Amino acid sequence: MGHLPPPAEVRHPVYATRVLCEVANERGVPTADVLAGTAIEPADLDDPDAVVGALDEITAVRRLLARLPDDAGIGIDVGSRFALTHFGLFGFAVMSCGTLRELLTIAMRYFALTTMHVDITLFETADDCLVELDASHLPADVRGFFIERDIAGIIATTTSFALPLAAKYADQVSAELAVDAELLRPLLELVPVHDVAFGRAHNRVHFPRAMFDEPLPQADRHTLEMCIAQCDVLMQRNERRRGITALVRSKLFRDSGLFPTFTDVAGELDMHPRTLRRRLAEEGTSFRALLGEARSTVAVDLLRNVGLTVQQVSTRLGYTEVSTFSHAFKRWYGVAPSEYSRRG
């Protein structure tokens, strides 16, 4: 349950990026610096209908982390500001669910309407349930941020209506978290769960199965059905929005570091290059922008996770000069690739 599609194909509401920029501004980093190297415009942050690509979200997070390498808990700061009302009809659907089981089912069905990057899996036995949050599919350098953000976001958005249920089963619930205890403790004080182990390699919550099917206090079947119908409409609209951009992204990310040319992609899509260029422009992007997005994502992986040198990464990504790659990398992340690599 809850396994995510490839990041290149995922799109989320703009709300989380707006909060990210708010946190950045408070810490002295301008919005323009956070969004540089992405297809997100500052004006998009105030558009309630805007959606952003997950890869652009990851790029924005990387830029902020690169600017603030010594700031701990940025993910928790962002996630703790989330509110279900900011997610529109999906948020109201969640608040109207009859049980935690129904809530998780709805969340997975409309996962694209959330801002979550972590993968959620449910395991059940006759008496117990275990929910695991996993970020292993994300690039290593941003996993910690998204684990922090999404755990904090879950706590912040569900406490108001799930608190009575959590209090009833407090002595039967336990959690194992990879998050730093001191950073998360202020949020956990809002939740009546006392058995929490920090510093683990995974993020799991154990609770009795009876709790999963216990009625929630704000359940409203009529509101839920109305919101579900509208969520279906939103999902269909977002699917149509993916269009040709998602297809081109999938071609670029097919073989990490070996990027096809524009002509190659047009040929694979059985489309004249002029037609492909026009279709991408209609969706507000270009092959050059998408190639830059792919290169920026792969560059970080090759530097940090594969351990290649700056020269090797430059060659692998198709640059003829290391200086050209270094200039592009600094434009994407605000620091030189050599400095980024040293930070590990």
Curated annotation (Swiss-Prot):
InterPro entries: AraC-type_N, Homeodomain-like_sf, HTH_AraC, Tscrpt_reg_AraC-type_HTH
Pfam entry (one): Arabinose_bd
One Gene Ontology MF term: transcription cis-regulatory region binding
Domain of life: Bacteria
Keyword Transit peptide in record: no
Cellular component per GO, a single term: cytosol
Keywords: DNA-binding, Transcription, Transcription regulation
Disulfide bonds: none
Protein name per its UniProtKB record: Uncharacterized HTH-type transcriptional regulator Mb1430
Species of the source: Mycobacterium bovis (strain ATCC BAA-935 / AF2122/97)
Lineage: Bacteria, Bacillati, Actinomycetota, Actinomycetes, Mycobacteriales
